[in-house]
């Protein structure tokens, strides 16, 4: 192409188009910095080393004077310049901003990390604030009490119930810790000691049973055995006193039922025979027995009325005898045999006397009769009470 621009040369004087395409030689390159003495001094003035950095107050005294000349004593030495612009310094921020060598360029990763940490800090702050607010809201006793009261729960009653249950459990634990003897004494030791002291004074004998509690225990056990023996004998006597009565279950044998039916038939036949004999005049009716029976009934009724009235006075009209019939037309009849009524069901029925269940006074008295020492007055008083 005619108007194609020429490629610049690489400093060797030969154009790039004239160089062979597949040449393997490495071309020479120019240095990045011109290290001539004049350029080095200029660079040293423009870029001082970090070791030569001083405070701003000291640097202001070394500035150029009014004529523009510098002090040779303050000029830095001829040192090769450094290309490291990132200077790590732990000094104050004032020193870093006062000199250009103290500045360091941040990396891209550092920016991202700083942004991430700032966001995380903000999120943590918000979360902590929200959690603190939630905790305050949850721990607010007034709001919680209002919610529980609306649900029908009384906090004070629940607390009282909890305290009572705790106190009950504590008291139960305390009672469980108390050791109870296996066998309690039959009599109280204090009462036994008082009675023994009283008896000792009557017998002119000074006794102090409280000093030796084993004496009280022995007396209590002796009284227990004595009472046990008396009660055992009374129970045995009461069992012997009561007879075992057979319970009538309502079932009878066929033989007894047949015998009863035969006896009833014989009784009816005998009564019919007696009536026929009276009607034929072979026997006379016994009026005297009837009158006697009526008189006894009147007397019994009079006695009952007198007892009810509370006076023993009897009136004549109450004791008047019944007039005997004197009709001439009455038929004479013989005496009815008294064994007829005896054979009937009008006779007395024998039954066993009702006994008191359990132990009664006479059982105890009979048990004490075998005890000859110190029971005479008790037995006499007991029998007197039974008679009354």
Curated annotation (Swiss-Prot):
Superkingdom in the source lineage: Eukaryota
Cellular-component GO terms for this entry: transcription factor TFIID complex
InterPro entries hit by this protein: TAF4, TAF4_C
GO MF, any single term: DNA binding
Residue numbers of Phosphoserine PTMs: 36, 49, 80
Keyword Phosphoprotein: yes
Region of interest: Disordered: 1-143
Subcellular location: Nucleus
GO biological process, one term: transcription initiation at RNA polymerase II promoter
Key words, A-Z: Coiled coil, Nucleus, Phosphoprotein, Transcription, Transcription regulation
Domain Histone-fold: 193-261
Coiled coil segments of this chain: 279-297
Keyword Phosphoprotein listed: yes
Compositional bias annotation for Polar residues: 12-22, 43-64, 79-98
Family, as annotated: Belongs to the TAF4 family.
Subunit (UniProt): TAF4 heterodimerizes with TAF12, forming ultimately an octamer consisting of a TAF6/TAF9 heterotetramer core flanked by TAF4/TAF12 dimers on either side, similar to the histone H2A/H2B/H3/H4 octamer. The 1.2 MDa TFIID complex is composed of TATA binding protein (TBP) and the 14 TBP-associated factors. One copy of each TAF1, TAF2, TAF3, TAF7, TAF8, TAF11, TAF13, two copies of each TAF4, TAF5, TAF6, TAF9, TAF10, TAF12, and three copies of TAF14.
Protein role: Functions as a component of the DNA-binding general transcription factor complex TFIID. Binding of TFIID to a promoter (with or without TATA element) is the initial step in pre-initiation complex (PIC) formation. TFIID plays a key role in the regulation of gene expression by RNA polymerase II through different activities such as transcription activator interaction, core promoter recognition and selectivity, TFIIA and TFIIB interaction, chromatin modification (histone acetylation by TAF1), facilitation of DNA opening and initiation of transcription.
Name assigned to this protein: Transcription initiation factor TFIID subunit 4
The species this protein was found in: Saccharomyces cerevisiae (strain YJM789) (Baker's yeast)
Gene name tied to this protein: TAF4
């Amino acid at each position: 192409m005619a108007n194609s621009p020429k490629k610049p040369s690489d400093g060797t004087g030969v154009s790039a188009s004239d160089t062979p395409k597949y040449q393997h030689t490495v071309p020479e390159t120019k240095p990045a910095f011109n290290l001539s003495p004049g350029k080095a001094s200029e660079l040293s003035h423009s870029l001082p080393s970090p070791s030569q950095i001083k405070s701003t107050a000291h640097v202001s005294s070394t500035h150029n004077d009014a004529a523009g000349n510098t002090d040779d004593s303050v000029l830095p030495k001829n040192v090769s310049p450094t290309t490291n612009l990132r200077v790590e310094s732990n000094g104050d921020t004032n020193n870093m901003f006062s000199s250009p060598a103290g500045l360091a360029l941040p990396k891209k990763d550092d920016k991202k990390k700083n942004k991430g940490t700032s966001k995380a800090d903000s999120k943590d702050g918000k979360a902590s604030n929200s959690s603190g607010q939630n905790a305050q809201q949850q721990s607010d006793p007034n709001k919680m009490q209002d919610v529980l009261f609306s649900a029908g729960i009384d906090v004070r009653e629940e607390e009282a119930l909890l305290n009572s249950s705790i106190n009950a459990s504590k008291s139960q634990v305390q009672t469980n810790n108390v050791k109870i003897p296996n066998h309690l004494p039959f009599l109280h030791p204090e009462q036994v000691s008082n009675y023994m002291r009283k008896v000792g004074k009557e017998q002119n004998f000074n006794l102090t049973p409280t000093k030796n509690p084993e004496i009280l225990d022995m007396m209590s056990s002796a009284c227990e055995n004595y009472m046990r023996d008396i009660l055992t004998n009374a129970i045995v006597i009461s069992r012997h006193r009561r007879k075992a009565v057979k319970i009538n279950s309502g079932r009878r044998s066929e033989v007894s039922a047949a015998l009863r039916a035969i006896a009833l038939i014989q009784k009816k036949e005998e009564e019919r025979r007696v009536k026929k004999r009276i009607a034929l005049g072979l026997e006379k009716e016994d009026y005297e027995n009837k009158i006697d029976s009526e008189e006894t009934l009147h007397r019994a009724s009079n006695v009952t009325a007198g007892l009810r009235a509370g006076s023993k006075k009897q009136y004549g009209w109450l004791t008047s005898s019944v007039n005997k019939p004197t009709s001439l037309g009455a038929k004479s009849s013989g005496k009815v045999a008294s064994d007829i009524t005896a054979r009937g069901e009008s006779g007395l029925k024998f039954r066993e006397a009702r006994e008191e269940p359990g132990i009664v006074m006479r059982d105890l008295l009979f048990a004490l009769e075998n005890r000859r020492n110190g029971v005479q007055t008790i037995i006499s008083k007991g029998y007197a009470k039974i008679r009354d």
